[in-house]
Amino acid sequence: MHNIFKGLITALITPFKDNKLDLYALERIVKHQIKHEVDAVLIAGSTGESSSLSFEEYKLLLQTSVEIVNKCIPIISGCSSNNTTYARALAAESTKIGVDGFMASPPSYVKPTQHGIYKHFEALHEVCNLPIMLYSAPTRSGVDFSDETILRLSKLPRILALKDCGVDLERPLRIRATVKKDFNILTGNDEVVLAFNAQGGVGWTSVASNIVPNICKELLEKWNKNDTKGALEIHQKLLPLYTALFVESNPIPIKYAAHYLGLCENEIRPPLTEASDSAKKQIENIITSLSIKI
């Protein structure tokens, strides 16, 4: 099975207008990614406010994204839930709609054991024929995969990757030493992309690339061509942007940045709130200093 989980994957925001999906803005957002040749887009992940979507909205978001992309780049859907039955329904619907793969985190809030985490993903693996990326986000889910559970899950034939949002930079080395050769490890933290890939990572699921996919793509291309100096120069330039985009809970800052650049409304669903005035100012200043335009 082809492994689509590599390179630059943009964790897309979900645009809303009047508390409904804004499909016109979605088209602008997705086409911006296609234009700059990202390697894939992730729909309905944490950055996409997936927990706020109804099942019907989830289906519409995926269906519309598939139509817009029209097979130009892979689409990865988010299928995270603390309810295994519901997560299976998301995975089954993703398969039916025609996405290229999906990502899921361990069930949040309920704090399953490692055996429970394994059984959850085994159930997702059984319900579809799509490639799967594990999503390690312990600050969000409250639990994480142990290295041993990652190894066990990697032996299931369609579990092909791990997106790691942790800060343990030894982890990719440890995992790489035990898993099958075609199992990919990617970072979900913009600010550590180079350090993570130096330790065995092969890609990056990025929030910043919602607004600077061209720069993020250039950074990764330089890194992959062993132009370490060039990659570091770009990374250094982007560090203030990474900081600004996490000055408040993701996706609050990136939603405002996208709005400021004309991609979508600055509408975010409760319990998240709009960016504070100080956060807005910080975001505006860095966008201006980097001359970011859409």
Swiss-Prot record:
The active site is at Y135 (proton donor/acceptor), K163 (schiff-base intermediate with substrate). It is found in: Cytoplasm. GO terms for molecular function: (R,S)-4-hydroxy-2-oxoglutarate aldolase activity; 4-hydroxy-tetrahydrodipicolinate synthase activity. Pathway: Amino-acid biosynthesis; L-lysine biosynthesis via DAP pathway; (S)-tetrahydrodipicolinate from L-aspartate: step 3/4. PROSITE patterns: DHDPS_1, DHDPS_2. Pyruvate binds at T47, T205. It is an enzyme of class 4 (lyase). Pfam families: DHDPS (PF00701). The keyword Amino-acid biosynthesis applies. It catalyses: L-aspartate 4-semialdehyde + pyruvate = (2S,4S)-4-hydroxy-2,3,4,5-tetrahydrodipicolinate + H2O + H(+). The keyword Lyase applies. Belongs to the DapA family. Homotetramer; dimer of dimers. Catalyzes the condensation of (S)-aspartate-beta-semialdehyde [(S)-ASA] and pyruvate to 4-hydroxy-tetrahydrodipicolinate (HTPA). This is 4-hydroxy-tetrahydrodipicolinate synthase. The gene is dapA.
